[in-house]
Amino acid sequence: MKDITKQVAGAMVVFVQGDKWRFSYISKRKVKNKETNTIEDKETAPKRYTYLFGKGEKALTAAQRFDKLIQKQKDNLFDLLSLDDFEDAFSVEKLSKEFFKSYKEIYEHFVEFITGKRYVKKGSKWTEIQIHEAHFQLRNYFDNDSKQARDFVKRMLGRIVFLYFIQKKGWLAVPKGKKWDEGNPEYLFELFKNAKYKESFYSDYLVPLFFETLNNPNVQKENNELRFPYLNGGLFDKTQDYKYDKLALPSEIFEKLFSTFNNYNFTIYEDAPDEHTIAVDPEMLGHIFENLLEDNKDKGAFYTPKEIVHYMCKESLKTYLLAQDEKLFADELAKTSLEKIIQQQELNEDEKAFAEKNAYRIIDALEKVKICDPAIGSGAFPMGLLQEIFNAQIYLQELKGFKKAKSDADIKKHIIEESIYGVDVDAGAVDIARLRFWLSLVVDEEVPQPLPNLAFKIVCANTLIPLSTDKSNQYQIAGATDIIKEIEKVRHNYFDSSKEEKKDLERQFKNLQNKLWNTAKDWVISKDADLYQRLLEFNPFEDKSCSWFDPWWMFGVKDGFDIVIGNPPYLRIQGIRDSNPKLADALTKIYKSASGSFDLYVVFVERALQIVKANGVVNFIMPTKWTNAAFGKGLRQILSDKNAANKIIYFGAYQVFDASTYTGIQFFKANSDELSYYELDRDLKSNDELSDYLQSLTPISGTFIANSKLTSDIWTLTAGGTSKIIDKLNLQPRRISDIFEKIFQGLATSKDDVYFLYDCVDEGDDIIGFSKQLNKSIKIERGFVKPLLKGEDVHRYDNITSNRVVVFPYKLENGNAELYKEDEIKNQFPLAYAYLKECESILRDREKGRFNIDDEWFQFGRKQGINFAEKEKLVAPEISLGGNFAYDKNGRFYSTTKVYGYIKKDGVKESYLFWLGLFNSKLFWYFIQQTGYVLRGGYFTFKTNYILPFPVPKIIPTETISAVEELVKKILKKKENSYRKNILNEEKEIDNFIYKLYDLKTDEISEIER
């Protein structure tokens, strides 16, 4: 492959392998550097994209893609096809989306048939709507529970797609006397095609196949006319589906299912980062899970692209190995050698000598590693680590010239048993994760072997709730030591047990739980009366989520994990409090990081640090907002106390997920000397290019911050030349917090549609405005409303105007807002009172009835911003592309929550005009871009905590103040006459004065204005 790509950026190559042949497109690219805006000579590693053709392979996708290339060339005879055209023709991501779209449509057809309901997307939310009456089977089989029906359909489809991979190996319906790879690769479709009564295909054909054939240990016997594999492990266990034996499902949906699946190639191999087969692979199961759950994004779950999974797994494994013998692995030769072993790159002579000398030690470390994903989802991260550990072991064994004592499948099985653990609160996630591990073993088997039982490897539980917060109670209980050893033995034996042995071991486990309870009950009453009652709740053999998680009781891991890795849920506490107030209360009680309006991922970091070993590593992909947001204070303090901030790779505005979530890869390791910070420095079109960026990172390309300098205060993280400029600015002694007494958010009414009136027209002492709540115009007294600004009304230097008002049930006395009494409104403002009464029930019902208070039901939800609005101030929208500050000289305007007001401290000599110029300057915008929080489209949030840290010189020369003020006055004058007036010259002069104030040099100014 290297030889092919030495001279060209792209090549089409055919590789022939017997009756199969691979048609590959191999490409490499040069990289555009975002900072310098130039194309760098550094090329990416070559990548191969392959269609598999030949006997038993599908060609529809390839034919459609190649035809598109032909048509494009026909339409543009004088334009050559570009690399982008070829990459589109060989796009794996495109195939994944196509397949998932078809799969989801089939899923929805089945669900709609049973429930009469279908999920549709309204805005960013999935909403269930009734299409038609529910089928009688919803009542008869599913107890009128739509979720039961949805879960059944997911399991059924999951089993079918799993069997598509199995039949690809030739393991279904193997004729008597034939080898295991000579089964029918079209078995499922032919089973349906030949079915006499297709309406009963599920009950008459799939039920026997799933639960009587594939779950039968005798089905593999040679004397059977047709042999099938015995797929134990729980995938075809009937426990959850015993009620549905007679279920009838429409034949036309099955027909659509099989015709769709038959259009795609299924491959049993999961690709390496630089190898891509354009086919449906086992990883697709993860994609299906992460996207199929209609409320998954509401749960904060997002599917992680495999390029990121590969990188995180390799880096975590490297970090783990380096920590095993810090003296041995301290020098650069050791680090480089380990990196190349994990990357499977060619070693030079010195590296090879190191690897050969230390092979046993490295293999031993690889066999002992303990890995946990605390929110396992589809199992992508543990699956990735399984593959990396396997690859590294094989690499070292081949280097030493060892003969393999075990098959690939046996090696993987051993890794799963000794190293892999996962937890998820969602039973569906646990099912899919287990399924992926089974598939990873099936891939490498030449003949079917019993699958391991993963009940004690991947559990359904709430990771965030510990069994007990008193660590001393859990392991030292008089008389319980022998029982605990017995439990460990059951756990070990269960992994490889047969169907009959499983039942016996399950009984043993439950008996031992009860025995433990009886042994410890007297001790328990005096220590923790609930502890062992909670223990009995854990039943790994059911798909019911346990309300707590403990690595020792569930996995036998007492001293912590070496690697905790994953993609934790992103959920704000407000959403959790609405859906599960009990959990919200528990989190705030248990975790220091659960402060303010926290997001769930910060709690996952704290929990991960509790369950990782002292020298272990936590590696998550998650938002970086915690570094500079108020809610991150608790987590920042924890990391500061432990010196645990190790590495952050921030992706900026590049959206790794199909959501407005801005993330980074983040490593946490106790007792780290410094935090390495990297920031995406190039424009990316795809996750492939993201992979190239990650591979290009070197220690010298980051910025390093001593952990001793990181506190609970906001972290200002910048990279490259940017870091030097920010460091220089930060030498200034004052901050915006020293200048402004109040930076306040606008009105929080908790029912804007009632309080805000639109398109207002003066009518003497009254105003006529449109009420969205009543969907009509209403008349109201002028004295009962205030002018209202929304974010869209505020632009840089503009003369502020608005045709909106806010209904304002407060009177201002001595600068304080006091709520009118109901009788006062009734007598003084009868029009306003009539309007409020018309909306009374809505206002009383706000926030679950919190305002159902006589004489106060019309008050705002919060009093923020009420007392300060009628003062001279600056105003700015919360979200903005560049500075958009304006001047409310007379303090006329109130605003929504999306506009902030700025009021100076007494004694600050610089006028509002000067600060208006500074806030609208390029330097201030640059500071926000480098230290703030990016949103879609390059917009940034101008919330208080991002503004306050801006550095301010101790003394600002009078001539600078005067010059900026005069220039701002000129701009405001021009804007009064026409908002379209050109003000570029004045703005440039203001920028130059600000640069001079901060002593910025030509190269620094060029960096800021780039």
Language-model features: locations:
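Polybasic, glycine- and aromatic-enriched phosphate-binding surface used to engage nucleic acids
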Residues: 1-64, 242-247, 251-252, 270, ...
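Short, hydrophobic/amphipathic alpha-helical patches that form generic packing surfaces
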Residues: 6-14, 158-167, 208-212, 290-291, ...
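Signature of N6-adenine DNA methyltransferases within the class I
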Residues: 9-11, 18-69, 73, 80-100, ...
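Class I S-adenosyl-L-methionine
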Residues: 76-172, 181, 251-411, 429, ...
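Class I S-adenosyl-L-methionine-dependent methyltransferase module
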Residues: 78, 173, 365-368, 372, ...
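Flexible, glycine/threonine-enriched loop-and-boundary segments that flank and lead into catalytic domains
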Residues: 137-148, 270-271, 350-370, 413, ...
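Non-catalytic DNA-recognition/assembly elements of restriction-modification systems
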Residues: 147, 376, 519, 560, ...
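Conserved hydrophobic/aromatic pocket- or pore-lining residues that grip, position, or stack substrates
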Residues: 288, 312, 377, 433, ...
